[in-house]
């Protein structure tokens, strides 16, 4: 009887599968790196567009609250926060102390996120709810630009609650008065609010300059606009519209200075709180316009 053979002559001729060579591996890694370099900016752009969409929605909601407030208050705009002893759109009142019912401002020298979340946000949110918009704007998170929460300068502000500020024009750039929607100088395309310039915050390095930039809920137009979204920022107008405005267009209306930086409405040489039509410091704005509502 012939015994079965267990030899595998054919298998002896099979060569093991070859692995990747070093060069092939490096080529694959290079291709992955190129694809990542191409995709990451696109993904960042998608994220930024999503944040801007939420940003515009925030502005619309705040502006709707402004219009509703006007409808219920003889067409007046709300107090903007320059008079710290009365209710305004962002709070019941403002204070650097800790009396009950007032919005306590954070320190000009800054702090950490934990400090602000623990010490100031628990006070500033209830103060907002007691302010003029408390019954119109139920969710205080609407006051924050989605990309602002990633900004370290957020924790060097006194007014920690809102990324947006109102135009000082709503009180005619002075304390104690408020404009009306029905005023002849108020037009539908007048800019009522915008994203504040997050780069201008008080720090020990600059001698706590710009302390007035974030100590309330309103600014002069030439105190600056946000750079979070590149060369434009969100604004809202008196007719309720909200959109992204090119920074160059904003500063054509607001007025710029030789340094290229916004000067601030209360800068030296600008008279009583306005830089409109003032060229002594190089301001190029001509009032009235969409930002400087009044001559």
What are these regions (language model features)?
Residues 7-10, 23, 29, 63:
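Generic alpha-helix initiation/capping and coil-helix boundary signal
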Residues 53-295:
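Short, well-structured segments within or immediately adjacent to enzyme catalytic domains
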Residues 5, 12-13, 37, 74, ...:
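Generic N-terminal simple sequence motifs
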Residues 17-57:
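Amphipathic alpha-helical segments typified by the pilin-like N-terminal helix
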Residues 1-20:
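N-terminal leader/signal peptides at the extreme start of proteins
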Residues 8, 21-25, 34-42, 93, ...:
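Acidic/proline-rich low-complexity IDRs
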Residues 4-6, 30, 37, 41, ...:
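Residue-level signal for well-ordered alpha-helical scaffold segments within enzymatic catalytic domains
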């Amino acid at each position: 009887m012939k015994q079965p053979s267990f030899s595998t002559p054919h298998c002896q001729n099979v060569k093991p599968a070859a692995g990747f060579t070093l060069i092939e591996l490096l080529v694959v890694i290079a291709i992955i790196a190129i694809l990542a370099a191409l995709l990451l900016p696109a993904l960042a752009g998608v994220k930024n567009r999503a944040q801007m969409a939420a940003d515009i929605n925030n502005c619309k909601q705040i502006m709707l609250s402004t219009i509703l407030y006007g409808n219920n208050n003889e067409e007046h705009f709300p107090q903007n926060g320059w008079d710290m002893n009365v209710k305004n759109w962002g709070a019941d009142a403002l204070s650097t102390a800790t009396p009950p019912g007032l919005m306590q401002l954070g320190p000009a020298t800054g702090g950490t996120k934990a400090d602000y979340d623990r010490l100031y946000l628990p006070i500033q949110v209830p103060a907002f709810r007691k302010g003029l918009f408390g019954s119109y704007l139920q969710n205080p998170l609407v006051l924050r630009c989605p990309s602002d929460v990633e900004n370290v300068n957020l924790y060097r502000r006194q007014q920690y609650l809102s990324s947006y500020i109102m135009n000082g024009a709503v009180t005619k750039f002075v304390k104690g008065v408020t404009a009306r929607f029905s005023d002849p100088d108020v037009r539908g395309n007048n800019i009522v609010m915008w994203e504040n310039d997050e780069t201008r915050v008080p720090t020990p390095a600059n001698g706590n300059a710009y302390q007035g930039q974030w100590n309330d809920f309103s600014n002069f137009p030439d105190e600056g606009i946000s750079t979070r979204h590149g060369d434009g920022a969100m604004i809202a107008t008196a007719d309720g519209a909200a959109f992204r405005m090119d920074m160059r267009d904003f500063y054509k209306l607001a007025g710029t200075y030789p340094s290229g930086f916004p000067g601030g409405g209360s800068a030296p040489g600008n008279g009583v709180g306005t830089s409109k039509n003032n060229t002594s410091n190089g301001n190029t704005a001509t009032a009235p316009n969409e930002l400087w509502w009044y001559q």
